[in-house]
Every structure is written in C-alpha cells, then in structure tokens.
Swiss-Prot record:
Taxonomic superkingdom: Bacteria
Domain FAD-binding FR-type residues, every copy: 15-136
Family listed: Belongs to the SIP oxidoreductase family.
Regulation: induction: Repressed by YqjI and Fur. YqjI is required for nickel-dependent regulation of yqjH, while Fur is required for iron- and cobalt-dependent regulation of yqjH.
Name of the protein in its database record: NADPH-dependent ferric-chelate reductase
Keyword ATP-binding: no
Keywords: Cytoplasm, FAD, Flavoprotein, NADP, Oxidoreductase
Source organism of this protein record: Escherichia coli (strain K12)
Keyword Hydrolase applies: no
Subcellular location: Cytoplasm
Function, in words: Plays a role in iron homeostasis under excess nickel conditions.
C-alpha cells in the first residue's frame, strides 16, 4: 500500500489579458451580483483551482485601457496611470464558453459599484489566473472558513464536491454581516455549513471546538488579512501538516 501523503499541486498558466464582453447580469442572491462574460478572447482560458483568482481591470470614464506586454522577462506596462483592479474568483463554464464573476455587493467598492452598473455589451479586461493550486477532491475531511469574500470560491468547491459519487465530510464556517447572504449557498445539500456572526472571536471559538482528524484532511481559511493570520495560528501546531492547510488573505481592512 502506498502511504505517501497526497498534497495539493501547483500548476502554472500562460498569463493573458483578455478583453471580454458582458453577456448577462444576474442577481443570483440577496448579496451577490453575477456578471457573465464571453467573447473570442476567452479561447484557451483555464482555471483548475477552486480558489483561483483572476485580476479584473475596471474601465474608467474617457479612458481606454491599453494592456501591458507579457514578455519572458515579465510584464511591461505602458506609460500612464493604470485602471483600478481587483482579484476575483473565476467561475468558468467550459460547455457554454462563458466566464462568470460573482460580486459581493457592498458600499464603497470600485468592483461592487461597477457590477451594479454593468450592462450587456460592456467591456471588461480580465487577466489570469496565472497559476492554480489543484486540491485533491477526495480528502476524507475538509474544513472551509471564510467570510463573504470567499463565498464564491467555497461555492465553486462545494458544487464540484457535490458531484462526487462518495462525498467527503465537509464542514464550513461562514461569517457574514447579513444573514440574507445565506441564500447564495442554499442550493448545496449534504454539507455542514455553519453561519456565524462577522466576528473573529466567534469564529476562533468555534474552531477551538472542532475535532480535526489526524490524517487525510484539508483546511482552507480566507477572509480579511489579519483575521486569516490570527485564525490560522492554531493550525501551525506540529500535529498539522502545513501542506494541507491553506490560509490566504482575500482583502485587507484599511
């Protein structure tokens, strides 16, 4: 029997900047607006990791975005100011040849503001994902911790796991400011999803109660940078394999 641990694997993608067209705008949840993109530039798009991120470049009034040149030495940007950009989880439908981005709607965000105003025919430049972390789907136990910013990646992962003949044991701790956001994951059955107040101490207290198996597990923690750092400390103990614990900041409080 091969007892070698199974670990997530990193893969690289060729970096391309794609100008895509808004095909549809859908309010898929009380808290999320979906923008569906398409176009010939989507040819060759690939995204193998459930928490991949693509960088979106938001158009500015009276300004035409000129993408940089990608060379073997790196990215060469043209002179002048760059448009604002944000990282988002790509939800790619290979059969329909469409790329969906789910935006958490909140006040004051350049991305949220654009998503609320977007109309079919609008243009959006999308870069990446530059690389993917391919996480095995069949870990016996899987723990996911996130706030609203990580919910699209969590949704993508759970939709994939739901298609397995044998589902793994999954626990998800999702902290939200508004319980109306829960409908974003309402269609996913067979998983233990716990909804918590948007409070670091509440999440940490719940983590302290959880029993993580000694092997064959995967742990994923995302959210605000300092919160992720603090929550992930308990998984730095020697009984946890760092290659099966993924902690990533999705945003930073100002």
């Amino acid at each position: 029997m091969n007892n070698t641990p199974r670990y997530p694997q990193r893969v690289r993608n060729d970096l391309r900047f794609r100008e895509l067209t808004v095909l549809r705008v859908e309010r898929i949840s009380a808290g999320f607006q979906r923008i569906v993109l398409g176009g010939e530039a989507l040819d060759g798009f690939t995204s193998r990791g459930f928490d991949d991120h693509s960088k979106l470049f938001f158009p500015q009034p009276d300004a035409h975005f000129v993408p940089p040149t990608v060379t073997e030495e790196g990215i060469v940007w043209p002179e002048g100011p760059r448009p604002p950009s944000r990282d988002y989880t790509p939800l790619y439908d290979e059969l329909r040849h469409e790329l969906a981005i789910d935006f958490f709607i909140h006040d004051g965000g350049v991305a949220s503001g654009w998503a609320m105003q977007a109309q079919p025919g609008d243009k959006l430049t999308v870069a990446g994902p530059r690389g993917s972390l391919v996480v095995p789907e069949d870990y016996a136990y899987q723990l996911y911790v996130c706030d609203e910013s990580g919910m699209p990646a969590l949704r993508r992962r759970l939709e994939t796991l739901s298609k397995l003949a044998v589902k793994p044991q999954v626990s998800a701790l999702v902290s939200v400011r508004d319980n109306a956001c829960q409908d974003y994951l309402a269609h996913l059955d067979g998983f233990n999803i716990e909804w918590l107040a948007h409070d670091e101490q509440a999440v940490d207290a719940r983590l302290a109660q959880m029993q993580i198996p000694a092997d064959d597990y995967f742990i994923w923690i995302t959210g605000e940078g300092k919160v992720v750092k603090n929550l992930s400390r308990r998984f730095e103990a020697e009984q946890y394999d760092p290659q099966r614990v993924r902690a990533a900041a999705y945003w930073h409080a100002k």
